[in-house]
């Protein structure tokens, strides 16, 4: 077998019959499979041992040679080579066909490659191949020309003979008629009898004339057909063809079936054809030119790559190895077989019958019919169902052909090559493990023992608990006492990977150090649930074991959960307290008035109450019941840093650990601050979830990850502790309906009745009534909600859970305790009848029914969304999988300008709302200079929160930052343009697969995006697409629904207002040609423009517009933006539009992820004029390739090619990738492979998918070349220390040391054990 690590590219091409015979180990002659009595393969059959190799290791068919010592001998009795049985997985056979057949992929694919090559319409091709028409394959022009006059004279003579014969016959008949009539007259017959005789005679004469005319016409047709005969001409009329052959057989040759195609191919001159096509393209117009371009693609492909077009017609069919189409015996003694065997059997049967017919010299019509059937059977084998009805097996199920084995989710690519199952894995239900540290998980003992079995066995032998591996295995299986101690030792510091399906982003699989636990459930740390999207209602997780030292190191360094606190999408912490923990911390940091032991100012009689010298003293007071944790106290602190302003006041030199200061706070808050790093400023406020998030964010920005991990772990422990102490529970009696509710409802019901009456009087139409009612009831719901919030006491657990941010929101509480309000119907419109009851009071039947409307739609939507979102992620991954960080800095000067703040009218700076996702975590492309010319932040600096704060203080509003959109690295991107990795907070490493991270970051929140299309007020009909469909529309670069025109030029608007349409004319400022936009529907409103002074107005006659400005409401067509504004603007447009959708759902994704995808969409150029380059006009090519070819041509003094950038949707861009392996495994497998084979495409194995498919390490992370080509040389000391170990005797390094102490895996196959040993 060839080693995948030793080749750098993989080429695919057309196999000629010669190649097929060279691969083959023998010809399959019989359709038999195995003998029903002996169950051994039949000789020369589809499973023949002589061709494919022995079925048992080292054993020939007849049993003469058994055992490995006869290796390589070919048995003289049965002809089987003595070798391993696994050669039956790799040896191929072949079938010699009695007649050539065409390959269905090249004839039936769209477009038909055979048709393009031979310039035949697919319909005609089909007639030729399936024996419905003859085709002329050769004409002897010279001979025909020379003898044309002679032949013409002969033809004239023949025609004259026919005419003379006709005249003679007519003459004779006319005389006979005259004689008959004379005779009748003599007899005195009646006139009607005479007339009948006359009519009869004339009819016969007419028939004679017609017959002669037909004969003459036939001779004319034969002659004209013959004189105009040309190669590739079809003759459908069989009689005509036979006549031609009889008369003029020596002047031409004709044929039908694949043989004729083969002859045409042999006589085909590629170079001449390519030249004539190029000429047509140069001079032609319209359809003719287009067709020539398409044909030239195919012709040029064969011309340049040494592929012979003869490969499209087969004389031999390869037979794949039998182990890949096995036959297995089922329990009942019956056999299950692969469909391929049936398909091969049909081919062999028909082929053998055809051979016999040809030997017998059967009539041509019978032979042709058999050849057609052979063609159809080979078609079914290659691609069943592509033409005509598919061949079916038992139960009318179409058989799976070779193409079907590759296609689709269940095909070879996606099922076996890209998604393999792995050994050393297990799965179980998860339960919460609150006692674990962030980097730990609880692994059930039994599961751990099974997973670590080989390690335990080795260790048992090392420790002399067992004599050999076999007895160690027995010990483990019997679970002896020593085994558990050894297991404990083996799993120490050996990380395991936990994965929860669906793995939507890279945090769906993380590494943990296992802790052995009783029971059978895996214990999971509560803080990683967010990343895994796990809960404990029966979720299951899979465990995988990294085996090699390198794998363990990667798992520990890159994948350990405590190193993955930040989200790769936004760079914000994911491992944050949630639910119970939030409630606990919120309760702990509360400040209650009027509770035990609170601070009391000194009076004349008493000293100050509630003052403590240290937190420890306060804690003692709590323990003895004299103080509440939530009471306000004064306490002296020495181990916590004071807040910033206080620190500047008290400690001008800066606070040091141990400096004392007094805080007025609660003990709970002191306890909370003890969890934070000592030098973090004291936080003296209540802690809802948002505030906790801000603090952890801040820690992640300013402290090492290990500190953050320890801090969140402490927060988790304390959160759970105080959540328990807080006694927060929810019961039905906690749901309090506000007493004011009936009055409010009554008041608004009166208003609603008024509207209803107006409607019935006809003062309002239905639409007006509905919108008025909706307004009334929305107001009512708000009022009830406010009353309810006011009515809840502070101590009530429900508002506490909501206010702390642990779960739920006030709208949900309003449904429970206030009123549900208005609900929507499936169209997304409000139903004007509100639900006036709360869930506590209970709904009426009608209310219940109305409510189910929305609820069902929600569930249906979620199901659809999940599938759509998964497919979007798949396309995104596919388009961006080869974007890998390849170098540190591409050295470009370019960048994009981002806004970090806006100046208000009064001169104050307001931080831009989107700094988080646009400027943060990027690299500066140019020095940031303030108004005085001072450099605030230098070029090349990383923009973290501190740097952005510095820029804001200096009054800078915009900065130029590096971006992947402007990166000039050839393949992939450079680290500086990408900026910092969101997940680590440092500059991205070389080898990071940023493309896949980007795809995951965009795809993962996809499920949260709404499905529905929004109804914009007043826009009926033309819905504005939102949510997931809008994201798909943008990434697929489709023309949006309800597209808005954009201004092609800068100028003044002339607006004409028609009945149903607007007409907008723009008069350009530069005096150029006017641009007219006609037939703009009035259902789409004109665009609202914001003026500098804050006014808003609709686009009006005489307004001035800038180039690229939208003229109507709706979404601009990205292709238009590209045409008018250029590639950079369309990139920024797409990024902003995608962000719009995600922001509306409150999802934070950094712009750089969207930029990575958008960059892939604009990688190609359409060639307009090829100049002196090799490119074909109209073809798509990579921008880098285009530029390098142009540079080369210009250097040689030639004419460069002209091209224009083209925006491709992600599906199209994935299929257009340079890697045929990646494209074939994505979609349209047969089409991609057909194309790749004709063009003899070579896959450079640059992306990830191609390498996964062939089984190489992926060129990302530590698999990238610059990390792989490193050799470690031990120092002298290390060497001395290693060899000082006494047990390393020389014998261990001898060849038959059986793998002892070398650390190598023992290749058991090479030792002559019989099969049963394993």
Curated annotation (Swiss-Prot):
Question: Keyword annotations for this protein?
Answer: DNA-directed RNA polymerase, Magnesium, Metal-binding, Nucleotidyltransferase, Transcription, Transferase, Zinc
Which positions bind Zn(2+) 1?
Answer: 60, 62, 75, 78
Q: Which GO terms describe its cellular component?
A: DNA-directed RNA polymerase complex
User: Cofactor comment in the record?
Assistant: Binds 1 Mg(2+) ion per subunit. Binds 2 Zn(2+) ions per subunit.
* Residues that coordinate or bind Zn(2+) 2: 890, 967, 974, 977
Picking any one GO biological process from the record gives: DNA-templated transcription
Catalytic activity as recorded in UniProt:
RNA(n) + a ribonucleoside 5'-triphosphate = RNA(n+1) + diphosphate
Keyword rRNA processing set for record: no
Any idea which GO molecular function terms this record carries?
A: DNA binding; DNA-directed RNA polymerase activity; magnesium ion binding; zinc ion binding
Family, as annotated: Belongs to the RNA polymerase beta' chain family.
Q: Which HAMAP family would you find in this protein's record?
A: RNApol_bact_RpoC (MF_01322)
The record's annotation in NCBIfam families points to:
PRK14906.1 (NF011498), rpoC_TIGR (TIGR02386)
Q: What is this protein called?
A: DNA-directed RNA polymerase subunit beta'
Q: Could you tell me which species this protein originates from?
A: Rhodococcus erythropolis (strain PR4 / NBRC 100887)
């Amino acid at each position: 077998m060839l080693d995948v690590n030793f080749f750098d590219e993989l080429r695919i091409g057309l196999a000629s019959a010669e190649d097929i015979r060279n691969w083959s180990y023998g010809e399959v002659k019989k359709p038999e499979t195995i003998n029903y009595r002996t169950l051994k393969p039949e000789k020369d059959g589809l499973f023949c041992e002589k061709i494919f190799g022995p079925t048992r290791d080292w054993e020939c068919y007849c049993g003469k040679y058994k055992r490995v010592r006869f290796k390589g001998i070919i048995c003289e009795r049965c002809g089987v080579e003595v070798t391993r049985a696994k050669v039956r997985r790799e040896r191929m056979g072949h079938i010699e066909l009695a007649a050539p057949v065409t390959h269905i992929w090249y004839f039936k694919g769209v477009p038909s490659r055979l048709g393009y090559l031979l310039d035949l319409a697919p319909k005609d091709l089909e007639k030729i191949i399936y024996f419905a028409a003859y085709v002329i394959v050769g004409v002897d022009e010279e001979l025909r020309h020379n003898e044309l006059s002679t032949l013409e004279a002969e033809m004239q003579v023949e025609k004259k003979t026919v005419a003379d014969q006709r005249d003679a016959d007519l003459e004779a008949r006319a005389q006979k008629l005259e004689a008959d009539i004379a005779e009748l007259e003599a007899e005195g017959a009646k006139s009607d009898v005479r007339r009948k005789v006359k009519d009869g005679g004339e009819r016969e004469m007419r028939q004679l004339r017609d017959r002669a005319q037909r004969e003459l016409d036939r001779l004319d047709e034969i002659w004209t057909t013959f004189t105009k005969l040309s190669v590739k001409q079809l003759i459908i009329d069989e009689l005509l063809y036979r006549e031609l052959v009889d008369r003029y057989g020596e002047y031409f040759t004709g044929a039908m079936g694949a043989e004729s195609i083969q002859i045409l191919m042999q006589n085909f001159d590629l170079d001449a054809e390519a030249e004539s096509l190029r000429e047509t393209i140069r001079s032609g117009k319209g359809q003719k030119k287009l067709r020539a371009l398409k044909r030239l693609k195919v012709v040029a492909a064969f011309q340049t790559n040494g592929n012979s077009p003869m490969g499209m017609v087969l004389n031999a069919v390869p037979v794949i190895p039998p182990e890949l189409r096995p036959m297995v015996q089922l329990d009942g003694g019956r056999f299950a077989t692969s469909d391929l065997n049936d398909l091969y059997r049909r081919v062999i049967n028909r082929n053998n019958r055809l051979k016999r017919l040809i030997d017998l010299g059967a009539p041509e019509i019978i032979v042709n019919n058999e050849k057609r059937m052979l063609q159809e059977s080979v078609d079914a084998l290659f691609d069943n169902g592509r033409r005509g009805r598919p061949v079916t097996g038992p139960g009318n199920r179409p058989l799976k052909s070779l193409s079907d084995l590759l296609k689709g989710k269940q095909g070879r690519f996606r099922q076996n090559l890209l998604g393999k199952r792995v050994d050393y894995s297990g799965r179980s239900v998860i339960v919460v493990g609150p006692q674990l540290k962030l980097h730990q998980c609880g692994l059930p003992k039994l599961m751990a023992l099974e997973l670590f079995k080989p390690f335990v066995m080795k260790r048992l032998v090392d420790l002399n608990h067992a004599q050999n591996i076999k007895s160690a295995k027995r010990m483990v299986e019997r679970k002896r006492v020593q085994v558990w101690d050894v297991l404990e030792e083996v799993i120490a510091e050996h990380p395991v990977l936990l994965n929860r399906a669906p793995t939507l982003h890279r945090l769906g699989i993380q590494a943990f150090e296992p802790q052995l636990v009783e029971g059978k459930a895996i214990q999971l740390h509560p803080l990683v649930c967010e990343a895994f999207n796990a809960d404990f209602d029966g979720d299951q997780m899979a465990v995988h074991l990294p085996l090699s030292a390198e794998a363990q190191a990667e798992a520990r360094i890159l994948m350990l959960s405590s190193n993955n606190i930040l989200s790769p999408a936004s760079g914000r912490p994911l491992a944050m307290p949630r639910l119970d923990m939030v409630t606990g911390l919120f309760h702990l940091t509360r400040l209650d008035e009027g509770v035990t032991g609170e601070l009391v100012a000194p009076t004349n009689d008493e000293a100050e109450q509630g003052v403590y010298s240290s937190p420890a003293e306060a804690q003692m007071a709590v323990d003895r019941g004299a103080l509440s944790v939530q009471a306000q106290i004064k306490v002296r602190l020495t181990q916590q840093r004071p807040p910033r302003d206080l620190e500047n006041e008290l400690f001008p030199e800066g606070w040091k650990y141990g400096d004392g200061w007094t805080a007025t706070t609660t003990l709970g808050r002191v306890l909370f601050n003890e969890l934070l790093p000592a030098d973090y400023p004291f936080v003296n406020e209540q802690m809802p979830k948002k505030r906790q998030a801000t603090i952890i964010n801040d820690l992640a920005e300013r402290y090492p990850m290990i500190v953050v991990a320890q801090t969140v772990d402490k927060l988790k422990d304390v959160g759970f502790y105080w959540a328990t102490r807080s006694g927060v529970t929810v019961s039905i009696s906690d749901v309090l309906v506000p007493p004011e509710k009936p009055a409010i409802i009554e008041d608004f019901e009166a208003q609603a009745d008024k509207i209803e009456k107006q409607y019935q009087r006809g003062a309002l139409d239905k639409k007006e009534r509905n919108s008025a009612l909706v307004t009334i009831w929305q107001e009512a719901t708000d009022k009830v909600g406010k009353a309810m919030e006011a009515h809840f006491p502070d101590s009530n657990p429900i508002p506490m859970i909501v206010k702390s941010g642990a779960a739920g929101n006030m709208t949900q509480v309003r449904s429970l305790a206030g009123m549900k309000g208005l609900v929507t119907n499936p169209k997304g419109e409000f139903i004007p009848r509100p639900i006036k009851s709360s869930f506590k009071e209970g709904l009426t039947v009608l209310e219940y029914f109305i409510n189910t409307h929305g609820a069902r739609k929600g569930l249906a939507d979620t199901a659809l969304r999940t599938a759509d979102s998964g497919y979007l992620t798949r396309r995104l991954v596919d388009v961006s999988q080869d974007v890998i960080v390849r170098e540190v800095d591409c050295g470009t000067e370019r960048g994009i300008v981002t806004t970090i703040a806006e100046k208000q009218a009064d001169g104050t700076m307001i931080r831009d709302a989107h700094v988080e996702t646009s400027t943060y975590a990027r690299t500066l492309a140019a020095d940031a200079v303030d108004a005085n010319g001072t450099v605030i932040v230098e070029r090349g600096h990383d923009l973290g929160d501190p740097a952005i704060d510095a820029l804001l203080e200096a009054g800078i509003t915009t900065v130029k930052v590096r971006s992947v959109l402007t990166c000039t690295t050839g393949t992939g991107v450079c680290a500086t343009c990408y900026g910092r990795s969101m997940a680590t907070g440092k500059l991205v490493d070389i080898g990071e697969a940023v493309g896949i991270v980007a795809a995951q970051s965009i795809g993962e929140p996809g499920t949260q995006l709404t499905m529905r299309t929004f109804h914009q007020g007043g826009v009926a009909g033309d819905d504005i697409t939102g949510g997931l469909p809008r994201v798909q529309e943008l990434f697929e670069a489709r023309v949006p629904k309800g597209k808005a025109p954009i201004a092609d030029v800068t100028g003044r608007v002339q607006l004409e207002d028609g009945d149903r349409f607007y007409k907008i004319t723009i008069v350009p400022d530069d005096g150029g040609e006017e641009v007219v936009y006609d037939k703009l529907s009035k259902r789409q409103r004109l665009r609202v423009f914001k003026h500098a002074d804050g006014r808003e107005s609709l686009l009006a006659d005489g307004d001035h517009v800038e180039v690229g400005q939208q003229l109507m409401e709706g979404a601009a067509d990205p292709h238009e933006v590209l045409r008018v504004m250029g590639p950079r603007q369309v990139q920024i447009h797409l990024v902003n539009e995608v962000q719009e959708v995600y922001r509306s759902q409150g999802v934070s994704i950094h712009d750089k992820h969207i930029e990575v995808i958008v960059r892939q969409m604009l990688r190609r150029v359409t060639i307009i004029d090829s100049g002196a380059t090799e490119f074909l006009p109209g073809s798509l090519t990579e921008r880098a390739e285009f530029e390098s070819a142009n540079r080369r041509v210009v250097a040689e003094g030639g004419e460069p090619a002209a091209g224009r950038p083209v925006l491709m949707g992600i599906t199209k861009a994935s299929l257009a990738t340079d890697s045929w392996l990646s494209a074939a495994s994505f979609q349209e497998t047969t089409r991609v492979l057909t194309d790749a084979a004709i063009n003899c495409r070579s896959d450079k194995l640059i992306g990830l998918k191609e390498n996964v498919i062939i089984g190489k390490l992926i060129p990302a992370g530590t698999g990238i070349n610059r990390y792989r080509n490193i050799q470690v040389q031990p120092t002298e000391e290390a060497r001395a220390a290693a060899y000082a170990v006494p047990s390393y005797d020389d014998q261990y390094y001898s060849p038959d040391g059986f793998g002892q102490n070398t650390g190598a895996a023992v290749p058991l196959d090479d030792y002559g054990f019989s099969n049963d040993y394993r």
